Amino acid sequence: LDAMSPLAPLHNPPALAVIRACQEERPDLPQVGVFDTAFFHALPDYVRAYALPAEWTEQSQPIRRYGFHGLAHRCMVERFATIHAANDTSTRVITLQLGHGCSVAAIRNGEAIETSMGFTPLEGLIMATRPGDLDAGVLLHLLERGVVSITELNDALNHRSGLLGPVSYTTLTLPATWEG
């Protein structure tokens, strides 16, 4: 998990801190890891593949769409099936995870067939502090011109973008928005 922390810096370090605290306080208790990316393990190849050169994507840690918020999406699908007495073999559902992090998933026959999040939790919908989908050319432009370092870019993409970005959504209120 330490090695994966750069891919999900808002999620993995706090989870590792809890794991280590539990190990220290109660080393006798077994710990079980449940990864929310597992819900997306069967994404079709054409969905999980990025249109990049194979030598980049076929590494020890393959570059592909993993999807995130799988525990929430699975729970929503199960709840939908309970409420509507739906049979997983005939159900098509779109689920939305809306919180500090946001994602959309399409589920057919109880299996995820599409997700808005990809290799990292940065991809997809605009979130509280993450930009969501972003033209890679913007990042190249910033790096090539020396506007930001890789470290600064990583920090900005995870902590200072999205609804906290330059549009300043944080200053909007619903009544003001409704008033036009």
Regions found by a protein language model. Name each.
Residues D155, G162-L163, L172:
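Adenine-nucleotide phosphate-binding core of ATP-dependent small-molecule kinases
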Residues R92-L96, T151-H159:
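Beta-strand segments within the central parallel beta-sheet cores of soluble alpha/beta enzyme folds
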